[in-house]
Amino acid sequence: MSTRTIIVLTLTALLASACALGDKRIYNHKIFRPNATSYLIAGGTNSRAVPTFIVGNPFGIAPATLANVVSSSLQSAFPGRDVTFATRRTTGLRDDVFMVVAFDPPKTASAQRICRSRGRISSITVGESIRTLMAFCLAGTPLVSIESKVARGSGTGDKTFVLLLRDMARRMFEAKSKNEI
C-alpha cells in the first residue's frame, strides 16, 4: 500500500472513532445546535416524555392542578404526536432536554437564566398581567424560548390561559434556534 492510502485510511478510521465516541460531545459544542423540534419528537424509550419545570403559581391554586393544566395545554399544541410534558419526576425521563414554564419571573430573568437554574428562580407578582416565559432547554442552554402576557384576571380554567400556553408552544417550536446551522 502506498503512504497516501495509509494516511487516508488512518484519518478515516480516526474520524469514525471520534463519531463513535458519542454524539453528546458534538451536540454540546456551542456552534452546533439541532432543531428543537427534532429533540422534542426524538425516538427512544420514554424519550418523548419531556421533564417540565413550573415556576410560580399566579392563581394560588393547588400545584397539582396547575401542573395538569400546563401539561395538557402544552400537549394540545402537538396533536397526533406522541409527546408528553411530565411535571412530576419519573424514572426513565430524559435529562438532556427539559421545558421550563415561568409565571411572573423577575424582569431580569432570561431564557438562559431559567434553563441554567432548571426553573429554580423566584416568582414576583407585579402589575395587571401575568408575564409568562417558556424555554425548551438542552443541557442548560435554551434551544428556543418565547415570552407573552395574559390578563391577571383569567384563571387556569379560563380558556384564554389554556390557549395562551398552547399557542406559545406552537409558536416556539415553529421558530428556528438562533444557534442552529
Outline where the language-model segments fall.
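A structural "domain/chain start" motif
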Residues: 19-76
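Non-catalytic macromolecular-recognition regions in eukaryotic signaling proteins
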Residues: 45, 71-84, 117-124, 180-181
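Solvent-exposed, acidic/flexible segments
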Residues: 59-67, 127, 154-162
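Short acidic low-complexity segments
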Residues: 82-95
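Surface-exposed short loop/turn segments
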Residues: 93-137
